[in-house]
Amino acid sequence: MAIGPYLSIFTLNVNGFNVPTKRQRLAEWIQKQDPYICCLQETHLKTRDTYRLKVKGWKKIFHANRDQKKAGVAILISDKIDFKTKAMKRDKERHYITIKGSIQEDITITNIYAPNTGALQYVRQMLTSMKREINNNTIIVGDFNTPLTHMEISTKQKLTREHKL
């Protein structure tokens, strides 16, 4: 199926996906928003519980979960697009997943959940290791757990007059 001139992708840190009502509300939200691809971070699912990622109309589900209820990422692809999987890669800590495939042309999608401790170094290392594989059809999303500005690094910083809103 042709997808037109754009590809809608949503990314969301779900902060745990074990409560049935939360899964149901998220499934309804995904169906209402109707993106082609949905990337989730912090699924907190055990490997055996990945059936909980099911959403009606979304049969292609790629996940990286652990045997403990922490971390975890997933990429869900809508049945409305003809995604053909070529390869999948995930780390043993289940902090990222990369899928390579094609829709109308080759595409690579990486979904990252950086650990709270050492997040900046983790993201730098990830991007450095992926450097040779990144091209115009590479999409990298996720929760990088890094501050956007120096003001966000520490809540103990005093605000000067120019920084106050």
Write out the residue ranges for each language-model feature.
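A shared catalytic/ligand-binding motif for oxyanion handling
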Residues: 1-165
